[in-house]
From Swiss-Prot:
Single GO term (MF): protein-exporting ATPase activity
Name of the gene encoding the protein in the UniProt record: secA
Domain of life: Bacteria
Disulfide partners: none
Cofactor notes: May bind 1 zinc ion per subunit.
Catalysed reactions, as listed in the record: ATP + H2O + cellular proteinSide 1 = ADP + phosphate + cellular proteinSide 2
Sorted UniProt keywords: ATP-binding, Cell inner membrane, Cell membrane, Cytoplasm, Membrane, Metal-binding, Nucleotide-binding, Protein transport, Translocase, Translocation, Transport, Zinc
Positions with a binding annotation for Zn(2+): C909, C911, C920, H921
UniProt-listed SUPFAM superfamilies: Helical scaffold and wing domains of SecA, P-loop containing nucleoside triphosphate hydrolases, Pre-protein crosslinking domain of SecA
CC per GO annotation: cell envelope Sec protein transport complex; cytosol; plasma membrane
NCBIfam families per the UniProt record, alphabetical: PRK12904.1 (NF009538), secA (TIGR00963)
Enzyme Commission number, as recorded: 7.4.2.8
Location(s) in or outside the cell: Cell inner membrane; Cytoplasm
Organism listed in the record: Cupriavidus necator (strain ATCC 17699 / DSM 428 / KCTC 22496 / NCIMB 10442 / H16 / Stanier 337)
Designated name of the protein: Protein translocase subunit SecA
Length: 925
């Protein structure tokens, strides 16, 4: 109540921000007459003037009014479009590291040019991030005319581009590309063996288009570069038959023993997206596996040697119970291709991880491809948080404002519309069955068709869109279908969707990137005419003129019929996706309407609100085919959606908390790798590692602060001779001295090792040996980092079980992952020292060849794949990583700290605990 009163007096935070921005808008508008007087060359010359002023110390904020005015004037001349005042506000929001929420049709693409131009003045690069290659190329070509006019270079970063073209794109002032490609390039840059092979510059400023889709919807799916692992394709084929022999249990057993409607061998947790075997199911599965010879007679599925079989069995159960053809994936060209649940697009080249994709391939009878080993991985959260400045824009972000602030520190600012919105959002209609719902949808579509009103029907799956298409065919209603299967015709279908009597069925419209203009999109249709090779220039001009004349009458006709009507056939689990569908109507103050038709069979209602709504229907004694249309029901559904959104937020937050630990380690490894790549001579680094290893060996046999009688000198001499080829007369030295300090013995060992090493270097020359040292270090870092990623993955999959021992899984993960990381550094140190110290050299040429073979072996890994991982809460553990003993871990940490670049005592601890290093793992040293 008090909050509401304060808002009335002072206005909301959003209103106060908009008011501040309007003051700057007035300054920009006042500059317009001044820049209108400039010639094209003088206007272009302003970019260089701004650059010089910025180099002289003037901030971007001080340049903003003039830069925005120049950009607007250039847009008027080149694009024939003048930025509205609300677009100027949007540009300022983007420059201030915030998210601009702008309604569909308000011109987000043009708005971004203001902030892009201003930040490109620094020369440090601006990345404009889109959801697919088509939009990246389209926007770069479209807006590139404006940037080129202003003297700025524009590049496009597409997948499968040649290396030189990628480098050129990144060296441009402005680079357009997809979130996946930017992320994969970062990972690839940290796998190169030559600094000149890197493509990215330091990450400066990024504007993320459809920011909610990229930073929220895709945040549960890390980017992964992987290579082939051990071949187990036959096992997937054999496991595929088992789910068919098991019966599904209906209902989940509660604590009091009730809840099971029909007993079975496994039950499906739709909320958690998991499958679990019942006790009877375990016994039956063990019996089947025993008959197939996969486990021994009387053996348990939980025996250590059978853990892998358990993993494959659960993958097969999930493939059969939770993943459905034409909803979650399609089958094309002997491949299973994932369908993006948020946009309905095909995600070619991406694969589910954890053996799930192979299980689906076995289920569908296509070729089962080998499992992969992770070579490099990063989440979008941690990639985008590396930019100095980050901003975003979308039509729907306000519902996720808390998450943007919490995870990314990005505030959402809702930008006012240029003209008042006129769309009418009607109450949801809820039916008892799916058939009743589709009958009502068809009636609504027919009514619109007869009145000449265009309709856009939104569905949540390919299966639904094709079913509805069949119903409309039966009713002889002409229509277009836009789903993952018709991806190639997407732009053409959307361009026509606003014409009178047009019926368009589409799987989720999120990120489609094309406006639906009432009367049809003249620009798009003109583009298709321009691209037609069969028409002469005169015919093209005549057809375009005819199109423009027709458009005005069609536009008025559609407006009179009520504008675009949106029909939703099901509520998505995210309110934001529903809002994106609704947002297709009523652009730029046009009329429009929307309505959702639901049934009690819908997944969202069935899981979260079905019983409550069914009870209301029964209480009201609703006759067959009669819908409920009441605010209380709509509120129940929105409450269910909020529950799902909250749960998904918790999953993303949990993923981030785990990935933050790996991220700190990733930064350290990549920093070490880059130091090795860029060092003129890695000799000093190798010497430090060698000395650290020898100190450890020495202290194993000659502990500090001990008496001479406690020293194991003969054992030390043996280890030095056998492992390192060093003959050091330690016993003889002790006998010949009246008293001796242990440090003197250590110095003797160090001196002998240095002499032997210097002798090897002298044989081939410092330059040749330095190249070999560099190759060995890079090989060791890469190999052990890959193994470490696999260990972290296994650790995370089983860590939730620690909760049963009254331990905090997150803290346990942080502790054990740090111990694993200390062991990783120790392994790198020992391997580099052993290989470089014991290498047998005959000639410089031989050494050079060895270096080349090492680099070639690692830089040409077979069957590299780029994919999004699937992260689901509560995945079955595959194989818990063995927990390093605390004593060994302490020693490993000590060695690692001695041999690797040191963490400052007051720096944050790399384990991710949030404590200072000296108060956490620094105590080990």
């Amino acid at each position: 109540m008090i909050t509401g009163l304060l808002k009335k007096v002072f206005g909301s935070r959003n209103e106060r921000l908009i008011k501040q921005y309007r003051r700057t808008v007035a300054q920009i508008n006042a500059l317009e007459p001044k820049f209108e007087q400039l010639s094209d060359d003088e206007l272009r010359g302003m970019t260089e003037t701004f650059r010089q002023r910025h180099a002289g110390g003037e901030s971007l904020e001080a340049l903003l009014p003039e830069a925005f005015a120049v950009c607007r004037e250039a847009s008027k001349r080149v694009m024939k479009m003048r930025h509205f005042d609300v677009q100027l506000i949007g540009g300022m929001v983007l420059n201030d590291n915030k998210i601009a929420e702008m309604r569909t049709g308000e011109g987000k693409t043009l708005t971004a040019t203001l902030a892009v131009y201003l930040n490109a003045i620094t020369g440090q690069g601006v990345h404009v991030v889109t959801v697919n290659d088509y939009l990246a190329q389209r926007d770069a070509e479209w807006m590139g005319r404006l940037y080129n006019f202003l003297g700025l270079s524009v590049g496009v970063n597409l997948s499968q581009m040649p290396h030189d073209a990628k480098q050129a794109a990144y060296n441009s002032d402005i680079t357009y590309g997809t979130n996946n490609e930017f992320g994969f390039d970062y990972l690839r840059d940290n796998m190169v063996y030559d600094p000149s092979q890197r493509v990215q510059r330091p990450l400066n400023y990024a504007i993320v288009d459809e920011v909610d889709s990229i930073l929220i919807d895709e945040a549960r799916t890390p980017l992964i570069i992987s290579g082939q692992a051990e071949n187990q394709t036959d096992l997937y084929q054999r496991m595929n038959g088992i789910p068919k022999l098991l019966e599904r249990q209906i209902g989940e057993e509660k604590a009091d023993g009730t809840g099971v409607e029909k007993p079975g061998d496994y039950y499906v947790d739709e909320k958690g997206h998991q499958v679990y075997l019942t006790e009877a199911g375990h016994e039956k599965a063990e019996e089947i596996l025993s008959q197939q010879g996969l486990i021994g007679e009387g053996e348990s599925l939980y025996a250590p040697q059978n853990i892998t079989l358990m993993h494959h069995l659960y993958a097969a159960l999930r493939a059969h119970s939770l993943f459905h053809r034409d909803q979650h994936y399609v089958v094309q060209n002997d491949e299973v291709v994932i369908v993006d649940e948020f946009t309905g697009r095909l995600m070619t080249g991406r694969r589910w991880s954890d053996g799930l994709h192979q299980a689906v391939e076995a289920k569908e009878g296509v070729t089962v491809q080998q499992e992969n080993q992770t070579l490099a991985t990063i989440t979008f959260q941690n990639y985008f948080r590396m930019y100095n400045k980050l901003a975003g824009m979308t039509g729907t972000a306000d519902t996720e404002a808390y998450e943007f602030q919490e995870i990314y520190g990005l505030e959402v600012v809702v930008i006012p519309t240029n003209r008042p919105a006129q769309r009418k959002d009607q109450q949801d209609q809820i039916y008892k069955t799916g058939k009743e719902r589709y009958d009502a949808v068809v009636r609504d579509i027919r009514d619109c068709y007869e009145r000449g009103q265009p309709v856009l029907v939104g569905t949540t799956s390919i299966e639904t869109s094709e079913y509805l298409s069949g119903l409309l065919d039966r009713e002889q209603l002409p229509h277009q279908v836009l789903n993952a299967k018709q991806h190639a015709r997407e732009a053409e279908i959307v361009a026509q969707a606003g014409r009178p009597k047009m019926i368009t069925i589409a799987t989720n419209m999120a990120g489609r990137g094309t406006d639906i203009v009432l009367g049809g999109n003249v620009e798009k249709q003109s583009g298709f005419i321009e691209a037609d090779p069969n028409l002469s220039d005169a015919e093209k001009a005549a057809r375009i003129k005819q199109l423009e004349d027709e458009w005005h009458s069609l536009h008025e006709q559609v407006k009179a019929a009520g504008g675009l009507h949106i029909v939703g056939t099901e509520r998505h689990e995210s309110r934001r996706i529903d809002n994106q569908l609704r947002g297709r109507a009523g652009r730029q103050g046009d009329p429009g309407s929307s309505r959702f038709y639901l049934s009690l069979d819908d997944q969202l209602l069935r899981i979260f609100a079905g019983d409550r709504v069914r009870a209301i229907m029964e209480r009201l004694k609703m006759p067959e085919g009669e819908p409920i249309e009441a605010g209380i029901v709509t509120r129940s559904i929105e409450s269910a959606q909020r529950k799902v959104e909250g749960r998904n937020f918790d999953i993303r937050k949990q993923l981030l908390q785990y990935d933050d630990v790996a991220n700190d380690q990733r930064k350290e490894i990549y920093k070490l790798r880059n130091d090795v790549l860029e060092a003129q001579d890695v000799g000093d680094m190798v010497t430090n590692l060698r000395e650290s290893v020898l100190v450890e060996l020495f202290r194993d046999h000659v502990p500090a602060d001990t008496m001479e009688e406690q020293w194991n000198i003969s054992g030390l001499e043996t280890r030095l001779r056998e492992d390192w080829g060093l003959e050091v007369p330690l016993a003889q030295t002790i006998e010949g001295a009246q008293s001796i300090e242990d440090e003197e013995l250590l110095n003797l060992i160090m001196k002998a090792a240095a002499e032997r090493y210097d002798g090897k270097v002298a044989m081939v020359g410092r330059e040749s040996f330095a190249g070999f040292e560099r190759s060995v270090m890079l090989q060791s870092i890469d190999t052990h980092w890959r193994e470490h990623l696999a260990a972290l993955d296994h650790l995370r999959q089983g860590i939730h079980l620690r909760g049963y021992a009254q331990k905090d899984p997150k803290q346990e993960y942080k502790r054990e992952s740090f111990e694993l990381f200390a062991r990783l550094l120790d392994l790198i140190k020992n391997e580099v020292t052993r290989v470089t110290f014991n290498v047998q050299i005959q000639s410089p040429e031989e050494l050079e060849q060895a270096s080349e073979e090492i680099e070639e072996g690692l830089s040409h890994l077979e069957n590299i794949q780029y994919k999004h991982d699937e992260f689901a809460e509560g995945r079955e553990p595959v194989e818990e990583a063995p927990s390093p003993r605390t004593g060994a871990a302490m020693a490993a940490a000590e060695l690692a700290l001695a041999g690797m670049p040191k963490v400052g005592r007051n720096d944050p601890c790399p384990c991710g605990s949030g404590k200072k290093f000296k108060q956490c793992h620094g105590r080990l040293s």
